[in-house]
Amino acid sequence: MLASALLVFLCCFKGHAGSSPHFLQQPEDMVVLLGEEARLPCALGAYRGLVQWTKDGLALGGERDLPGWSRYWISGNSASGQHDLHIKPVELEDEASYECQASQAGLRSRPAQLHVMVPPEAPQVLGGPSVSLVAGVPGNLTCRSRGDSRPAPELLWFRDGIRLDGSSFHQTTLKDKATGTVENTLFLTPSSHDDGATLICRARSQALPTGRDTAVTLSLQYPPMVTLSAEPQTVQEGEKVTFLCQATAQPPVTGYRWAKGGSPVLGARGPRLEVVADATFLTEPVSCEVSNAVGSANRSTALEVLYGPILQAKPKSVSVDVGKDASFSCVWRGNPLPRITWTRMGGSQVLSSGPTLRLPSVALEDAGDYVCRAEPRRTGLGGGKAQARLTVNAPPVVTALQPAPAFLRGPARLQCVVFASPAPDSVVWSWDEGFLEAGSLGRFLVEAFPAPEVEGGQGPGLISVLHISGTQESDFTTGFNCSARNRLGEGRVQIHLGRRDLLPTVRIVAGAASAATSLLMVITGVVLCCWRHGSLSKQKNLVRIPGSSEGSSSRGPEEETGSSEDRGPIVHTDHSDLVLEEKEALETKDPTNGYYRVRGVSVSLSLGEAPGGGLFLPPPSPIGLPGTPTYYDFKPHLDLVPPCRLYRARAGYLTTPHPRAFTSYMKPTSFGPPELSSGTPPFPYATLSPPSHQRLQTHV
């Protein structure tokens, strides 16, 4: 106030002093918010005339209330030269260049530019208030501020009060130089954790430093987030395991797929999988793939499976020369890893521990089978073993087989067994007269056969046989050499042929002849008894075989005439009338009951049997060679004994069913019953003293 009064006083003083009109205060550029009041000052000194304001060169008028401009007026004391222009409320059209003019004095103030500021409105987020994005996929959010704000607003992004970087600003200007559309795009790659997050777009300018905010909520679509677990995680082979596949997803899960070692598990559906654990689960993980409309996710896990030894690499048999080094290797797997030991087949001494066995400078006795044994470090997991053979290459090993003694001018056989690795190139028999490798030479013949496999890894073997036909005296004094050769050397053995005398054989032949003679006499006696008995009886004859059930029921107590110890083969005879004119054919033996039928006569004989029921035969000769026929094999045809010849007056002898039944029998010159002296019993042999051997009892 003091300054204003001083200014007025100076103007009056100058006026009184005759000074010219001048501006005491001129308007200046100013900025005003839309809707508020604008005041442009103007003060003149030493002037008492008309004062007016122009807007962009257009006179507003000289009246204080400025008719026609309802929001405009001039204020201040005109006597003191104060002419301030007021605009209220300011609108966008008020933005112009204003001058204060003293028309009568020809004074014009400098132009004053009035700027109208328009505060920005709340920005718009495209797609808001909830924007859907895909987790893991790059996306963007666009914030837009339209037009009428002056100056152009600044668009910023915030999350939880923290400004976000990575935005791009873009502004479009209208033709009238007014601010057009302003956009700010935020680029981001959201994650599933951003689901439901709130982001703010803020528009601020000089007209509104605090700015205006618009919030947007993120709604994320994301593929399943999977967690895979196994219960129990550590399991022994053969036990059950349950896998659980849990997933969160937006949109919801549409399917599950299980795989083991990359191969689908057929029939597996849903979030659970039950299996029986085996060793493969340790190296072939189980995976669970979960899908929805956005995508899929996969998780896998491997079990800690405890299992016993499993052979991965079997030891291989080796063949080395004597004196060289040999080695075997075998690979076992297991969980936990098994202990591996090496032993020799049939032995318990541990030769080595670990997957490899080394044998330096092998000898012939090192040949054989070696065992690689795997033992689990945990009980209840089982074990395993594998074996391989070591073959030691060496000169052939030749062994003689003890030859059987031979007769002079008889056959002989010499044998040798050859084991060799590598196989022998040749096996040769040599003696004084020459040598022979294969085939025949005079009285000599060589054959070869594979030898049975033996333990020790001596390589394949063969048996070489030298046959001699018609031995000579020199053969029993000569040494026969069997030799074999391969690339490593030669092996040989000498064999001498033993001689056999004929004296034991003669004794055996004599004994056999004596036995045959005795047996023939017994058969002849039986035949004579049957003939004499047949002439006095008219009933059928039945000869009972001991142990047979036939005819046992037809024997009465009166027929037993001796003790069971002394009784020999029992002959029971039943007679029937036969005539020579009958034409019935002779029947052969019935195999179902053991009888012979000759024109109604049934005969069953068992003669020559031992007391125990067996047929006595002389033992075979003990001097026979293996595979050669037994000399003097006495086996007469005693299984069929001819039936007794039946006699009747005016009838001839009947034919027998066996052609050899009575080869030594002489046909009598006359027919009829034998003449008996008076007092002679019907059976002459009944008066004889009991024989020392089993007797033949006859029952009528």
From Swiss-Prot:
- At the top level, the lineage of the source is Eukaryota
Q: What happens when the gene is disrupted?
A: No visible phenotype. However basal insulin secretion is modestly increased in pancreatic islets of KIRREL2 deficient mice.
Residue ranges under compositional bias (Polar residues)? 689-700
- What does UniProt say on post-translational modification here? N-glycosylated.
Subcellular locations according to the entry: Cell membrane
The annotated regions of Basic and acidic residues compositional bias extend over 564-576
Which cysteines bridge via disulfide bonds?
Answer: 42-100, 143-201, 245-288, 330-372, 416-482
Q: Which residues cross the membrane?
A: 508-528
Q: Which family does it belong to?
A: Belongs to the immunoglobulin superfamily.
Protein name (Swiss-Prot/TrEMBL): Kin of IRRE-like protein 2
Origin species: Mus musculus (Mouse)
The protein's gene is named: Kirrel2
